[in-house]
Amino acid sequence: MSEGSFEDRELEEIRRKKLEELQKKAELERQAQIVAAQRRIALKKILTPEALARLDNIRVVRPELAEALEQQLINLAATGRVRVPIDEETLKKILEAVYSQTRREYRFRL
């Protein structure tokens, strides 16, 4: 009978650990959603509707580029280095700068 209770305790411990993992994962996802919502609110404040639509299009095609661009836009607006609201033309110029920084260059030697 002691073997059965040992297995029960072991099984209960596995369940407890799995539950903790799931709770941690859910909390991380919730925090990520909060950060994304805060970022979206900030972007709505600093971009014109046209610029925001362009950013959304970029996000569909190149999510990593959109994320870098979003961070750059928020930083520029927070430090006052760009006039707010940012219009589509200004967004294009900032996009070119961010793209040139994030683009990977591949060189092949033959």
From Swiss-Prot:
SUPFAM superfamilies: Double-stranded DNA-binding domain
Record keywords, A-Z: DNA-binding
Protein name: DNA-binding protein PAE3044
Pfam families: dsDNA_bind
Molecular-function GO terms, alphabetical: DNA binding
Family: Belongs to the PDCD5 family.
GO-annotated cellular components: cytosol
The keyword DNA-binding appears for this protein: yes
The organism's taxonomic lineage, starting at the top: Archaea, Thermoproteota, Thermoprotei, Thermoproteales, Thermoproteaceae
